[in-house]
């Protein structure tokens, strides 16, 4: 009987230990999941602005004198046309009172340089746009994007701010005309590294990570 009692006692003790281990395991998993959720939510909350881009609405006139530099009106003319000037003219049309070259240069920095290529591709796809004026939403530069997403930065002293008081006044005029909006930042997922922050994306990193994992898996199997 003594042996049976000892066996029963040891079995009960083992079951209690197993139950405790299960509880500890579940608590460990629950703790890990909780911290993972906290980290992910923190990333989303802090980085959600990266998923949005700022766009400015402008009346864009595809001036044939700028686009076609030769009498033949060749496709090569479109590829080498000065679309930066077209964007400058569009901004100047919105602010006709600005005539100073320095101020015009600052104003032209409101729009991302990537839009020059986008306009070129647009005209190549539809050459009938030459000579026409259409309304387009153009991607804003990184500094305008940052200020637009963070209104509190407007309260910072001019010397510590990304843009001057004059540029801030222009931005407020654009806002007053409802010519600014935030849209989903698709470039973040389809573009790679860039020297221009508003054009940077994670595509290159994703592809690199995929192939790294792929090669690792291939080499890890016999």
Question: Would you name each region that the model predicts?
Answer:
Residues 1-24, 30, 43-199:
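Membrane-topology segments of multi-pass transport proteins
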